[in-house]
C-alpha cells in the first residue's frame, strides 16, 4: 500500500479514535464522577487541546492526500477523500477558533452571574445552543471521518 495513503488513513483513524474516546467515555464520565462545575472546568481545559490534536492530524492527512495526488503525476485524484478531509478540518477549525471561544465567554458570563447552565435564563439558553452546535459539529466530523475510511477501504479493493 502507498505510504502516503497509510499516512492519511492512519491520521484520520487516530483522530476518530481520540474523538470517540473523549466523546463516549471521558466527557460523560467527568460529568458522572465530578460535580458539574469541576467537570465543566475539566472539559474546558481539554477542548482546546482536543481541537488542536484533531486539526494537526487533519493537516497530516491532507499532506498524505496531496502527496498521493502529486506522486501519481496528477493521475490519482482523490476528490472524495479530499472533500471529506477538508470538511473534517474545516469543522474542527471552526469549532476551535470560533465556537469554543464563544462557549468559553458564555460559560464565564454564566459563572460570574451565578446562573446555572440548565436554567431558562437567556445566557443559559445561549450556552445550550452553542453546546448543541458543538455536539452536532463533532458528530458530523466523526461521520465524515468514518465515511473517509470507508471510501478508502472501497478504493483499496479497486
Explain the meaning of each model-derived region.
Residues 1-158:
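Polytopic transmembrane helical bundles with strong interfacial aromatic enrichment
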Amino acid at each position: 500500500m502507498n505510504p502516503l495513503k497509510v499516512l492519511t488513513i492512519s491520521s484520520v483513524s487516530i483522530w476518530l479514535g481520540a474523538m470517540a474516546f473523549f466523546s463516549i467515555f471521558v466527557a460523560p464520565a467527568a460529568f458522572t464522577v465530578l460535580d458539574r462545575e469541576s467537570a465543566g472546568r475539566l472539559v474546558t481545559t481539554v477542548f482546546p487541546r482536543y481541537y488542536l490534536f484533531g486539526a494537526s492530524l487533519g493537516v497530516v492527512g491532507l499532506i498524505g492526500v496531496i502527496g498521493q495526488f502529486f506522486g501519481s503525476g496528477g493521475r490519482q485524484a482523490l476528490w472524495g477523500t479530499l472533500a471529506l478531509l477538508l470538511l473534517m478540518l474545516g469543522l474542527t477549525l471552526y469549532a476551535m477558533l470560533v465556537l469554543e471561544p464563544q462557549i468559553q465567554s458564555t460559560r464565564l458570563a454564566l459563572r460570574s452571574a451565578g446562573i446555572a447552565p440548565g436554567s431558562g435564563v437567556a445566557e443559559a439558553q445561549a450556552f445550550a445552543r452553542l453546546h448543541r452546535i458543538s455536539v452536532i459539529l463533532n458528530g458530523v466530523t466523526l461521520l465524515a471521518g468514518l465515511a473517509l475510511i470507508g471510501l478508502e477501504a472501497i478504493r483499496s479493493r479497486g
